[in-house]
UniProtKB/Swiss-Prot annotation:
Originating species: Myxococcus xanthus (strain DK1622)
Matches recorded under CDD domains: ParAB_family
Subunit structure: Interacts with FtsZ in pull-down experiments.
Lineage: Bacteria, Pseudomonadati, Myxococcota, Myxococcia, Myxococcales
Result when mutating D90A: Lack of activity. Cannot complement the deletion mutant
Annotated protein name in UniProt: Cell division protein PomZ
Principal location: cytoplasm
One Gene Ontology biological process: cell division
GO cellular component assignments: cytoplasm
Keywords for this protein: ATP-binding, Cell cycle, Cell division, Cytoplasm, Nucleotide-binding
Length: 319
């Protein structure tokens, strides 16, 4: 995918300034991602630090729009100035495609890292945004669970692989397949935050129950406690009575995890993914783009606060 261009209004929104604050010598009709990065440096407009988050998008139920959501979320974080690594865990390579690339064009995937001990840095690819990198996936990833089975410490392979590169990134986003196996167990063990995209239907409850049981078992058996679990209602249509009833049920049974932001049903969102473009490139003014931005606005203060607490604890322990 070619690098997008942005208007002065869009650039000002990303930088958190008014268009008039953009230096006159830097003003132009269309800005590239590199132009924006230079402006960030000139104006010193970098976002609040998040403390190297590792965030997993996962639901054991398929068809929830998870990949469209995770890739557009990662893209938008990068537009806002965060250094982001998107890791495609699904052998179908949909996250790779949503960034405008074909998985088959890449020789190496995460399989090479987890099984063949290839350094993760050698598998990471550059996207059309200077601060968004990705790890591609293709059908070779379909054998990763089987290959991990006989290995010692198999559930920690991904966490260990990240150690050499995660300091370069504010956020690592994992896009996982809708299944439970060793690869997704690795992702859960590596993650700080879990995003669970759901549709407003009662079938989603079955997947949620199993997922939360899995999270609880990780806490009890492997002593891994997630910092945050965010349930995100995706593709919501308020004209459907059943959708409203399902949303009310989610609010009743999972109030502490359910994000107040709802991603409304948006044709342009789905179309953008099929075209291999994040919704913020295809139509930044669409309902899908606005709702994902609202979701980010909702969770960022929590993540910034968590990073500040962690930094304080680290300083106290060092002292």
């Amino acid at each position: 995918m070619e690098a997008p261009t942005y208007s002065s209004k869009q650039v000002a929104e990303m930088l958190g300034v008014s268009p008039k604050q953009i230096p006159e010598e830097s003003r132009k009709d269309a800005y590239t991602p590199d132009d924006i990065w230079e402006l960030r440096t000139t104006l010193d407009r970098f976002p609040a630090r998040l403390g190297h988050r590792r965030q997993l998008f996962l639901n054991f139920k398929g068809g929830t729009g998870k990949t469209s959501l995770s890739t557009s979320y990662a893209w938008r974080l990068a537009e806002l100035g965060y250094a982001v690594l998107l890791i495609d865990l699904d052998s179908q390579g949909h996250a790779t495609k949503c960034l405008g690339y074909e998985g088959e064009d890449f020789e190496k995937t995460l399989l090479d890292v987890l099984v063949r001990k290839t350094p993760l840095a050698k598998v990471i690819q550059k996207s059309s945004l200077p601060n968004l990198d990705f790890v591609p996936s293709n059908l070779t990833m379909s054998t990763v669970d089987l290959a991990l089975m006989p290995m010692a410490g198999r559930e920690f392979k991904l966490r260990n692989a990240l150690k050499d590169v995660e300091a370069q990134y504010d956020v690592v986003v994992f896009d996982a397949p809708p299944s439970f196996g060793l690869l997704n167990l690795n992702a859960l063990m590596a993650a700080n935050d879990l995003f669970v995209p759901v549709l407003a239907d009662f079938l989603s409850f079955h997947g949620l129950k199993l997922l939360f049981e899995t999270v609880q078992s990780l806490e009890e058996d492997l002593n891994h406690v997630l910092d945050h679990v965010f349930i995100v209602v995706n593709s919501f249509n308020a004209t459907f009575k059943l959708a409203k009833e399902a949303l009310e049920a989610l609010q009743t049974h999972y109030p502490e995890f359910l994000l107040p932001t709802i991603i409304r049903q948006c044709t342009k969102f789905a179309q953008a993914s099929s075209e291999g473009r994040p919704v913020f490139v295809a139509d930044p003014s669409s309902k899908g783009a606005n709702d994902i931005q609202a979701m980010i606005d909702n969770i960022l203060p929590r993540l910034v606060a968590a990073a500040a607490v962690a930094q304080t604890k680290g300083t106290q322990q060092a002292g």
